[in-house]
Amino acid sequence: MSNSIDSQSLPTVSPTDYARFDPDTIHEKLDASLSRPQLNTDGSIRHFLGIEGLNKAQLQAIIAKAESFFDDKGQLINRPELEGYTVMNLFFEPSTRTRTTFEVAEKRLGANVLNIDIERSSTKKGESLRDTLWNLQAMTADIFVVRHSASGAAHFMATEVTPDIAIINGGDGWHAHPTQGMLDMLTIHREAPRPFEELSVAIVGDIKHSRVARSDISALQTLGVKDIRVCAPRTLLPKGIERFGVQVYENMNECVTDCDVIMGLRIQNERIGSPLLASSSEYYKHYGITPERVALAKPDALVMHPGPMNRGVEIASSVADGAQSVILKQVNNGIAIRMAVLSLAMEGQRAHQAAGH
């Protein structure tokens, strides 16, 4: 199969086809065709499937929309922009932060919220994903928020199954986690002392299996960050990552020196088929975010982590709970970003339908 998927061929592709791709190449096969199904002809968002294919102005519009949900004191506000609409959360993978913040965001927007119990759904009885979605669509859903272990699942839904329902990607396999990427951008926008164009960002951890890393790198580059550094053992780096314009380090101390932002990543043990690390203690010794390593960064550097954290493996507790950590702010910002994406996607979907599509 070629290194890109023509959107015209997508109706014959299922999530199981995407899932067999290696994490070294999955992004190449999906990203080229992401922009077409998720945007209206005027550039407005009607699905949110990935950051790839969106330009700087579109990402800035999402950030600005998220900012509008904070009051003058920095507190989140309610705004009934989805009153009368129904959102269904379809999480085929376990989640705490993402699912909960989506639900909070939906309720703050005034939506009717339904959490589908996948473990008790008909998919566990052999029903196909396509049939499950068509049945849920018949129940007058307006938005599906989906997390799935198959890379490309959200794209599959938006193009083949339910094009008239706004699809929000809550994470798909190895491929992408776009709302996490955008909440990270909102956090940097709100907390960093310099604009994106002047920042040096270090991303540390399991890059190879991380959908967060893929979304963060894409968003950072689109927003103008020129100095993006990645650091991991060779076994946790995707092949050819250098072609994405990032600087690759194996020495953690060198990677974080004079940087403005340190992003830690979780070791994706559930996605690793065979042991790729000698031990957790060995990993922490060479790649853990410790006070000593944070001290090598700029004095006002931010420390970030998408969670869940493995303390004493990826990050020291004193750093996670320290003054430079913005990890809990990331969680709060996640509500605002998800409110923004839900609102913008529904607005775009309404415009798409009004145009007679």
UniProtKB/Swiss-Prot annotation:
Keyword Cell division: no
Amino-acid positions noted as binding carbamoyl phosphate in the UniProt annotation, renumbered to this chain: R97, T98, R147, H177, Q180, G307, P308
Pathway membership, UniProt: Pyrimidine metabolism; UMP biosynthesis via de novo pathway; (S)-dihydroorotate from bicarbonate: step 2/3
Keyword Cytoplasm found: no
Entries under SUPFAM superfamilies matching the protein: Aspartate/ornithine carbamoyltransferase
Name listed for the protein in its UniProt record: Aspartate carbamoyltransferase catalytic subunit
PANTHER family named in the record: ASPARTATE CARBAMOYLTRANSFERASE, ORNITHINE CARBAMOYLTRANSFERASE, MITOCHONDRIAL
Gene expressing this chain: pyrB
Function: Catalyzes the condensation of carbamoyl phosphate and aspartate to form carbamoyl aspartate and inorganic phosphate, the committed step in the de novo pyrimidine nucleotide biosynthesis pathway.
Keywords attached to this entry: Pyrimidine biosynthesis, Transferase
GO molecular function: amino acid binding; aspartate carbamoyltransferase activity
Polar residues bias spans: 1-15
Annotated HAMAP family: Asp_carb_tr
Provenance organism: Psychrobacter cryohalolentis (strain ATCC BAA-1226 / DSM 17306 / VKM B-2378 / K5)
Residue segments, region Disordered: 1-21
Gene3D superfamilies linked: Aspartate/ornithine carbamoyltransferase
